[in-house]
Amino acid sequence: AVCGPRTTVGLEPSIAALRAGSQLALANKESVVAGGHLLFGAQVRDDQINPVDSEHSAIWQSLRSGTHAEVSRLVVTASGGPFRGWKRADMSDITPEQALNHPTWHMGPVVTINSSTLMNKGLEVIEASRLFDVAPDRIVVTVHPQSIVHSMVEFVDGATVCQASPPDMRLPIALGLSAPDRLGDVAAACDWTHASEWTFEPLDDEAFPAVALARECLRASEKHTAVLNAANEQAVHAFLDHRLPYLGIVDTVKEVVDAMDGELRGNPLFASVEEMGQVEREARRRADDLINSQK
């Protein structure tokens, strides 16, 4: 089975596929972010989920080099998006047209905006933590503008194992469908006959606070990460509709998370998909109220 819708509507069909014993090629990070507990609880065996996101596929492949106990850190790579190197003070007048111009990937508008704010990377940190059972503080984000190294695993002996290839989603999709086997001639490999440069830079959390916010929500609870995701979707749509400034995207999400924090801390896990939907709707409503108040 393949699950690829962009929002949490993919959760229920994914749960049904897992309960039926199907192998699931998962390209729907929102299901893990908002309802990972429900998703993983539907598995009838431990190896049912094949991650399709390029970063998680890379980690999944790299983890074959050691045991879980030997993993020191996961290193998630980010291209940096169209505003890599910008400071927060430079971002107030960014337009949707500018933010939709991603330097590496051609994606839908919401994912492209998420990539520009690095909220997409924050969601990927949440997904990696839950998929691979690694604590939030043991997941690092590094900016790698060439997008050749798709993510890495650092082991306790100091070795770092990565998966590298030219950016092409056919590769993780094919592996997600064929694993544990590999198909032949899926995509081009790296060209070792020409000089190339791979660079890695630290993430600027002041300019791009979305990853730190996602990490805070991950530490707090599954309900917090569901609110993060739902509020972000509303804020991104408002930005694309010219109803919210660029910096207002992550600021709005943080305000919603902070406002709902107290009511989310009772029971950290959702009892059902229906409860998740209720919390998501409330997060969207609050985000809309904040957005409308800024007009």
Predicted regions mapped to residue ranges:
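Catalytic, metal-anchored helix/loop core of enzyme active sites in primary metabolism
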Residues: A1-K295
